[in-house]
């Protein structure tokens, strides 16, 4: 499992060995013997496949020697045919073992990648709201997407391309040493070293060229999209020629970079072919010379040629393999960087669950700000009695919505305490805390699923009867009944297929399914028209019965019947009392009420 605090790796982005070391437990899980057996089985298939491949040139050599030395006699023909059949069987066996290896290992690779992705996803849900507000959602999901896609390919190349090639190279060196001596061994080793060094050097250069090409491609696309999105502005100012020139400049830069990238590939292919063919020509010339001296046979020529061809065939892809492994390690490291991200708001060790008998809420001298250089709440203190209806109002920026975020413990206050039923919320589990709270926000976001799913989301395992009861309580049951598909009606992405009032009723029903003792309405009607607002307010009043309710509001008319109204001003409690008490004081609340009443009167006069 991922650590609860960051491990502060030196540099996960570039430390490939450290990244592989961290991934090893996913590939060799201590708690899954079946997957470990699959890994062993895949390795066994690799070894059997490579052993078969290494045996093929021997069969090829024996068949050729039988044909050239036997003079067509029946025994020689029989031997030659036998080795030809052995060669064919060996090739089939090589393909068989390779595919069996893939079949055996596929589950290992997929499970390892899945478990890593699951750990990253779980970690993301543990991170604070600050992290998610600071990072783009698409950026985070892209890290997971790239990581899961590249890990599988990287593992394939590491385990089934690089490792078998190293095994084959070692075996070829031993075979050449035993059969032909030091000269051919030295030439082969030097050629492989030159091949690998050249491929790595040119591939590094090509990677930089490719990155530049991709960056310029993005710039060209961005300029085109920006220009077309601002079509009217371009026309207003007659700037078509300027836009065309800007796009042409970006497209030209991209084309130049693309040409360099493709030319570099040609250079890589030429360099690789030069090294391989120099070795092949030298090795075969040396073998032909040995044949002319009577030391070697025609079969030895075929033997050497076949081994070198088999050896360099996987090396032909070395450039792509190197890039893929390099990118895979970077993508995997990015996933580990997410896992290593510090959890800002965490449960204290052995934290108990919150037990709510009397759902009171207390803010005790709370000091908080989203940034250390900007304090939002300045020693805020107030108490919400169990079963009461309390409203929080104030000018924009007074810290009203911050109270809801602190109560849900999306952030911890710098100083002071927040208590529910006398228990400090920082000392109880976050799961139990949030189970005691329900919220209907200003913009209720729904999942891209059915109405039934969104209502039942309030509590895991909610029954259909509970969903029906919640829909009736939120006064949306009749609307659902009129829909052709009823509860199975899709709401669309973020609930866009529903009106604002319908979305709010679904959100209220979802909260009713949760059935928390404390309810928060965070400007739940501010985005609705007046008629819909009144309907929703009636529903909210019914829902709030027998619960502790905190309503954060901008329009004062929606909370005038609250038991207590808290008036915030610049992060401090300026006033508190009932609606009539606050009007009699003629303070900030009375000023806000008079201003909103005047604005409402102006709107009414304009409508008439």
From Swiss-Prot:
Its EC number is 7.-.-.-. SMART domains: AAA. Its main location: membrane. Residues 39-327 form the ABC transmembrane type-1 domain. Residues 1-38, 106-154, 203-266, 323-608 are cytoplasmic. The keyword Chaperone does not apply. It is a multi-pass membrane protein. ATP binds at residues 370, 394-405. The chain crosses the membrane at residues 39-60, 83-105, 155-178, 180-202, 267-285, 301-322. Belongs to the ABC transporter superfamily. ABCB family. Heavy Metal importer (TC 3.A.1.210) subfamily. Homodimer. This is ATM1-type heavy metal exporter. The lineage of its organism: Bacteria, Pseudomonadati, Pseudomonadota, Alphaproteobacteria, Sphingomonadales.
């Amino acid at each position: 499992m991922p650590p609860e605090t960051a491990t502060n790796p030196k540099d996960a982005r570039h430390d490939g060995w450290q990244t592989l070391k961290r991934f090893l437990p996913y590939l060799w899980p201590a708690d899954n013997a079946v997957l470990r057996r699959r890994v062993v089985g895949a390795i066994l298939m690799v070894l059997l496949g490579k052993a078969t491949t290494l045996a093929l040139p021997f069969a090829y050599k024996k068949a050729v020697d039988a044909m050239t030395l036997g003079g067509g006699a029946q025994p020689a023909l029989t031997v030659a045919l036998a080795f030809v059949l052995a060669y064919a069987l060996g090739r089939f066996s090589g393909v068989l073992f390779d595919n069996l290896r893939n079949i055996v290992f596929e589950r290992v690779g997929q499970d390892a990648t899945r478990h890593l992705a699951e750990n990253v996803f779980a970690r993301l849900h543990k991170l604070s709201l600050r992290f998610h507000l600071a990072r783009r959602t698409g950026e985070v999901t892209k890290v997971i997407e790239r990581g899961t896609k590249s890990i599988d390919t990287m593992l394939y190349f590491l385990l089934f391309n690089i490792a078998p090639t190293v095994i084959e190279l070692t075996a070829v060196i031993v075979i050449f040493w035993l059969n032909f001596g030091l000269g051919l061994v030295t030439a082969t080793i030097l050629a492989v070293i030159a091949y690998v060094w050249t491929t790595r050097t040119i591939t590094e250069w090509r990677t930089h060229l490719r990155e530049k090409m991709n960056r310029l491609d993005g710039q060209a696309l961005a300029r085109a999209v920006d220009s077309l999105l601002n079509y009217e502005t371009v026309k207003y100012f007659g700037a078509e020629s300027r836009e065309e020139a800007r796009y042409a400049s970006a497209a030209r830069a991209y084309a130049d970079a693309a040409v360099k990238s493709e030319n570099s590939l040609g250079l890589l292919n030429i360099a690789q072919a030069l090294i391989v063919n120099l070795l092949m020509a030298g090795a075969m010339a040396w073998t032909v010379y040995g044949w002319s001296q009577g030391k070697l046979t025609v079969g030895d020529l075929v033997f050497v040629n076949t081994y070198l061809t088999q050896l360099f065939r996987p090396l032909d892809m070395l450039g792509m393999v190197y890039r893929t492994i390099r990118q895979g390690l970077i993508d995997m490291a990015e996933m580990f960087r997410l896992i290593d991200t510090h959890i800002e708001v965490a449960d204290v060790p052995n934290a108990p669950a919150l037990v709510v008998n009397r759902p009171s809420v207390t803010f005790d001298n709370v000091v908080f700000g989203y940034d250390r250089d900007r304090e939002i709440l300045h020693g805020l203190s107030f108490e919400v009695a169990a079963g009461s209806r309390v409203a929080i109002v104030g000018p924009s920026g007074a810290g009203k919505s911050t109270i809801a975020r602190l109560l849900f413990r999306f952030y911890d206050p710098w100083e002071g305490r927040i208590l529910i039923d006398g228990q400090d919320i920082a000392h109880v589990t976050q799961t139990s805390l949030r189970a005691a709270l329900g919220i209907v926000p200003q913009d209720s976001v729904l999942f891209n699923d059915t109405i039934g799913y969104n209502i039942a989301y309030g509590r895991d395992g909610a029954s259909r009867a509970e969903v029906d009861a919640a829909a009736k309580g939120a006064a949306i049951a009749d609307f659902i009944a009129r829909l052709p598909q009823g509860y199975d009606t899709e709401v669309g992405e973020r609930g866009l297929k529903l009106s604002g009032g319908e979305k709010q009723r679904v959100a209220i029903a979802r909260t009713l399914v949760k059935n928390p003792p404390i309810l928060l309405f965070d400007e739940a009607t501010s985005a609705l028209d007046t008629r819909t607002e009144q309907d929703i307010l009636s529903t909210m009043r019914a829902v709030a019965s027998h619960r502790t309710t905190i309503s954060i509001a901008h329009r004062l008319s929606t909370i005038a019947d609250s038991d207590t109204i808290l008036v915030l001003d610049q992060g401090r409690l300026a006033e508190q009392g009932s609606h009539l008490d606050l009007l009699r004081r003629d303070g900030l609340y009375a000023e806000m009420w008079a201003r909103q009443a005047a604005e409402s009167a102006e709107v009414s006069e304009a409508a008439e």
